[in-house]
Amino acid sequence: MTTIALITGASGGIGRALARQLHAADCRIAAVSRDVGRLADVDAAVRIAADTTTPEGAALAVTACREALGAAPTLLAHCVGSTLIAPLHRTRAEAYRDVVRVNLDSAVFMLQAWVAALQGAPGAAVFASSVVARIGVANHEAIAAAKGGVEALVRSAAATYAGQGLRINAVAPGMTDTPMTAGMLKMPAMREGAARQYPLGGVQTAEQVAEAMAWLLGDGAARLTGQVLAVDGGFTTVRPLVK
């Protein structure tokens, strides 16, 4: 029986890369984006327009997947996200609420809709967090709060649904070369400066993050749940020798 995987935020760099990898592994992909036109070249069996920042939009994504592919998705990859780089005293309330809505609300509502659709069946989910939820990075207060909420959600839900056979994990990427970071990384000085922050050097690719997400969804991670895997070139855990 073919595995069905629902990928939200599938029009972004990491979502696209994950769709390619899971498609190559013979999964049937339901790709979700607010703008379905951006999914035209994404590897998917069905492309769904839905705003997962609302309960109704999240439920729509799961229902449309089930109706198109004949069953609820047993795999969920939530790649929706945004960022905000600003000190807290210069962060407007509207901007803060938008960051929480896009990053945390969408994760809560998507997980809620997916669990309900499975009706007690087992499955695996992976969410996108960030290194800024794990280590203090200046001027990232809003996104750190939102992604910290995602990590707490993952741990609590993993405990709640373990008995059902659901595995729920997350990845916490560092700076990744995607369309969302293209504006910063197109400047050589910014790219070189970012690369120097990581013990392994360089700026990681969307494909590298997607590989970690695909592994967490697969049988190789069958004994992992409630975990947040840092995909960050050692940024949050390693301090190399000073040369």
Where is each model-derived feature located?
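Conserved glycine-rich cofactor-binding loop
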Residues: 11-12
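Active-site helix of classical SDR
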Residues: 111, 146, 154
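Alpha-helical segment proximal to the catalytic Tyr-Lys
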Residues: 116, 159-163, 222
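Residue(s) in the substrate-gating loop at a strand-loop-helix junction
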Residues: 130
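Short C-terminal tail/terminal secondary-structure segment
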Residues: 225-243
